[in-house]
Every structure is written in C-alpha cells, then in structure tokens.
Amino acid sequence: MDAADLREYIEFEEGEVVRKTVFETERLWAQTVCLDRNGSYGPVSDRAADALLTILAGEAVFVIDKKRKRLKQWGATVVPAAAELVITNASTEPLVVLMVVAPPPPAETD
C-alpha cells in the first residue's frame, strides 16, 4: 500500500507554479499544485480524463469552461473531461490544491 505525507509535496517558488506528483498508477494520478500570491495555473484540459480538485490551503478561483467558482480551504470541485481549467490564487496566502485525475494523462515528453 502506498501512503504519503502531503506536506512533503508542498513547495513554493515566487512567480512559479510548483507541481509535484504524489501518486501515479495505470488508472489514477494525483499531484499538488502550489501557487504563491497572485499565481495562476492554466488554461489546461484533458479530453480523456476527469479531475477532482481539493483546496488543502488558501483560497482559489476556479474557471471551468468559463464558469467561475470561488472556494476556500477544504472546498472541492470536479473538472469534467475536455473542460478547460484555470486556477487563480484568490488570497494573499499561498494556495495548495490536490488534483486527482483519472485516467492519468499521457506521459509528458521533452
């Protein structure tokens, strides 16, 4: 059984989005997305996968296919397959989002 202390996957770099893979299997992928103040991530989409986003720390504005929702810590939302996603930090505090995607996206190539 795999287990993780999510605190080990939290890291911030000024002006950067820091993403760290927590788990990856054939059917599921989980990562943290860390945004400093005024940070944003996206737009991104995956035609074949749904995603569950949970705020672990901070406050975010999620724009999913041009629909806007503001959520605080412990808030969660679903991003349907093929939907475009943008995440924006909505507070002066750092933002940490746990993103769980199924099925996992194709491997990134350089």
Each model region followed by its residue ranges:
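A short, N-terminal "cap"/entry segment at the start of jelly-roll beta-barrel domains
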Residues: 1-29, 42-43, 77, 108-110
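Conserved short histidine dyad/triad with adjacent acidic residue
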Residues: 31-46
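Compact, glycine-rich, soluble single-domain proteins
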Residues: 40, 47-49, 63-65
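Short glycine/proline-enriched turns and hinge-like loops at secondary-structure junctions
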Residues: 45-47, 90-91
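Glycine- and acidic-residue-biased ligand/ion/polar-headgroup-sensing regions
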Residues: 48-60
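Structural motif
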Residues: 59-61, 68, 84, 94
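Short acidic-glycine-tyrosine-enriched beta hairpin
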Residues: 66-81
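Ligand-binding loop in jelly-roll beta-barrel domains
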Residues: 81-106
